[in-house]
Design a protein with these regions (language model features):
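Pol beta-like nucleotidyltransferase catalytic core
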Residues: 263, 267, 281-282
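Acidic, metal-associated active-site segment
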Residues: 72, 216-228
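Acidic active-site catalytic centers that drive phospho-/nucleotidyl reactions
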Residues: 34, 218, 234
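Accessory, usually C-terminal, subdomains that scaffold auxiliary metal cofactors
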Residues: 227, 235-261
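Short, well-structured N-terminal submotif of metal-dependent ribonuclease cores
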Residues: 2-66, 70-214, 239-251, 267-277
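Acidic, proline/glycine-rich low-complexity IDRs
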Residues: 256, 271, 279-281
Length: 282
């Protein structure tokens, strides 16, 4: 359903946003794409239309996050941003911005729907006909050098690298590794932290398994499994999620269906989206 929400004028980034309304509330099934999937569907008009048609038929919503924009700013090719914009234009207004940072807050109560990122949504509404699309605008701004300030690409690189280094440092501690081996997912902590603990167990217990800055970004995308019905992730993270599913379910945490390019994943995802009985995966 469409929802009209009164908003004040506020400043986000370098833009003054004067927006009276946000116009979308998420409705299931909720779908989330990793960067590669945004590119795949955005760059293929047939896949793009087929997916958008299935969203409209089921009343579903494509969920987006600041992780998408951070990763986007790291690439040199504007084609990535244009493919993102093509997908967004095809599905609008069936899009919703997730605030993944709030998912990691211990203070937040568990809710059926993910918290929204009102700033990102208002930024989309800044675009007018004839402007760059939202993602190309962010890509251009995010790579532009600013006197005395880091670019958005540099900020994202620093954050993902520091997360990777923190994981690598933590798993060198014997006590930490021992706790990871005996860890049991349970209620009482923010579900996002429980999910991350499960997804990272193999990395902590296996010294030979690298954990890079790219893995840090993939891990942020994987948080969408908590709320979304259909999630397309990198193959390695899809395997991690499936490996954690049973243990998390025993703790009362149900994950969405997850797909990758492997094992005919794109066709299986679209078939599930187009089957009414599969529309309520969560």
């Amino acid at each position: 359903m469409l929802l009209r929400i009164q908003l004040p004028t506020f400043k986000t980034g370098s833009y003054l946003v004067q927006s009276n309304y946000l116009h979308h509330q998420p409705t299931r099934p909720l779908v989330y794409f990793d960067h590669w999937a945004m590119m795949l569907f955005g760059g293929d008009s047939g896949l793009r239309r087929r997916f958008a048609d299935s969203l409209r038929r089921t009343g579903g919503t494509l969920c987006l996050s600041t992780t998408h924009t951070g990763e986007l700013c790291r690439v040199d090719d504007a084609r990535h941003a244009r493919d993102f914009d093509a997908l967004l234009a095809e599905v609008m207004p069936r899009a919703f911005w997730i605030d993944t940072r709030r998912l990691l807050s211990e203070r937040d109560r568990w809710t059926e729907y993910p918290p929204g990122d009102i700033h990102a949504a208002a930024e989309v509404m800044r675009s007018r006909r004839g402007d760059f699309g939202f993602y190309e605008s962010v890509w251009t701004y995010g790579r532009r050098p600013r006197p005395g300030k880091s670019t958005l690409a540099e900020v994202f690189d620093t954050a993902t690298l520091s997360t990777a280094q923190a994981v690598d440092l933590a798993r060198q501690g014997e006590d930490f590794r021992r706790k990871a081996k005996t860890f049991q997912p349970k209620n009482g902590r923010a579900p996002a932290w429980v999910l991350l603990g499960e997804l990272l167990r193999s990395t902590v217990l296996n010294d030979a398994q690298a954990f890079t800055a790219n893995d840090s970004a993939d891990m942020q995308h994987a948080l969408s499994l908590l709320h979304c019905d259909y999630v397309l992730l990198d193959g390695g993270w899809t395997a991690r999620a499936e490996g954690a599913r049973k243990r998390l379910l025993e703790a009362g945490i149900r994950l969405g269906n997850v797909y990758s390019k492997r094992a005919n994943g794109i066709d299986r995802f679209l078939a599930d989206m187009e089957t009414p009985a599969s529309a309520a995966a969560k």
